[in-house]
Amino acid sequence: MTNTTQDKKLWGGRFAEATDGLVELFNASVAFDQRLAEQDIRGSLAHVAMLGQTGILTPDEVAQIEEGLQGILADIRAGRFDWRLDREDVHMNVEAALRDRIGPVAGKLHTARSRNDQVAVDFRLFTKEAALDLAAKVRALRAVLVAEAEKHLQDEVILPGYTHLQVAQPILLSHWLMAYAAMLERDEGRFRDAAERMDESPLGSSALAGTPWPIDRFATAAALGFARPTANSLDGVGSRDFALEFLSACAILAAHLSRLSEELILYSTFEFGFLTLPDSHTTGSSIMPQKKNPDVAELARGKAGRVFGNLMGLLTVVKGTPLAYNKDLQEDKEGVFDSYDTLSIVLRLYADMLPKTVWHADVTKLAAARGFSTATDLADFLARSGVPFREAHEVVGRLVGLASRTGRQLWDLTDEELRAAHPLLSAEVARALTVEESVKSRRSYGGTAPERVREQVAAAKAALS
């Protein structure tokens, strides 16, 4: 990227002094908004075609401008375009390059258009495409989770379910996997819903009030793949809620991926030992030869913070900006780019890592059996026998306390101890409350019983097909 001030600014007619060098550096956005170059040129091609269709430009003028824009696009794709800081942004870089290439007729491209609607349409195009791309990547990860759930259903692998990170009740590993698949289904829906709401073209709104030129906004909207033009020109150029909605969906997805990461990190530790992450997605230590660090999961967890920050940053930018365009809105893009890039790679990594993760069913089953995970089942046994549940809860709570104080499990208690707590209890009853039976008993809709989880998997596969 070069930095020269030899050219007159395309907006410089009103000014008698050159722009201060530090202001030029501070004002420029081309270092990051050049990423919108393809969208910018697509918008310009749609605009100039419409100017020709409506008779505002002659066929020859349209042809010259189109040929020039296509040449610039080829240079950009080949990496030989000279991005210049003194030309501020992607729009002025492209327009100035067009003028250098085809001469004064390039100035007619901006007829009936402002940089305000130009940047708005570029940014909407990018954000809509990013939302749909992330939706597709989320869908791919959903499919991986569902496939893993189906695989582990074959052996009905049991995992401890937790509340407060303490063993609560036994569940199927497949049930746990399907919980994350359900979260991602909603994430995918949020991106698709956001893309549908932002499917309106602001091109033709001009600076803020529309234009007296006889343009056809419906034609440019259709040419760019939008469903319709924005209904209000002021809203079209002055609103960034489409970017906020995208970042909100990104933040919620990042939170879900962070929760998954946290559990994978915990479960891969020596203390848990539930799973082994693949060597291909872990790293070692420069000093401790035994270490196998879950860097992918840790970075996915850590990067959630920057995605949250991108949402809060843009909310803070737009909350105090009066209609319509303000230079503050230059700050809307980097957070969107960053969140998209961050989540794109995390989703791809997880889709690759999860099928290679090895679960240790013997360890997870043993862990599920500890911590009095079938205590609720014992209380339910009493309740089914006619004991009020609150009374049953208290009885079993006392037994848990006794077993805990004496270093035993519920099934280790004697007949005498159990009958002393309640005459309906016995050692035979306690021993019958296995983690397998506990899991099988949870047959309510959405529960962890194998037949219920199979229903969840079947429904998810049907939704993905």
Curated annotation (Swiss-Prot):
Q: Where in the cell is it found?
A: Cytoplasm
| Keyword vocabulary terms for this entry | Amino-acid biosynthesis, Arginine biosynthesis, Cytoplasm, Lyase
Give GO BP annotations, semicolon-separated: arginine biosynthetic process via ornithine; L-arginine biosynthetic process
Q: Which InterPro entries match?
A: Arg_succ_lyase_C, Argininosuccinate_lyase, Fumarase/histidase_N, Fumarate_lyase_CS, Fumarate_lyase_fam, Fumarate_lyase_N, L-Aspartase-like
**Cytoplasm as a keyword?**
yes
Query: Which GO terms fall under molecular function for this chain's record?
Result: argininosuccinate lyase activity
Gene Ontology cellular-component terms listed: cytosol
Read off the PROSITE patterns from this record: FUMARATE_LYASES (PS00163)
Q: So what EC number does this one have?
A: 4.3.2.1
Chief localization: cytoplasm
Q: Catalysed reaction(s)?
A: 2-(N(omega)-L-arginino)succinate = fumarate + L-arginine
Q: So, what pathway does this thing act in?
A: Amino-acid biosynthesis; L-arginine biosynthesis; L-arginine from L-ornithine and carbamoyl phosphate: step 3/3
Q: Which family does it belong to?
A: Belongs to the lyase 1 family. Argininosuccinate lyase subfamily.
Question: Which NCBIfam families does the entry mention?
Answer: argH
- Protein name, please? Argininosuccinate lyase
Gene that encodes it? argH
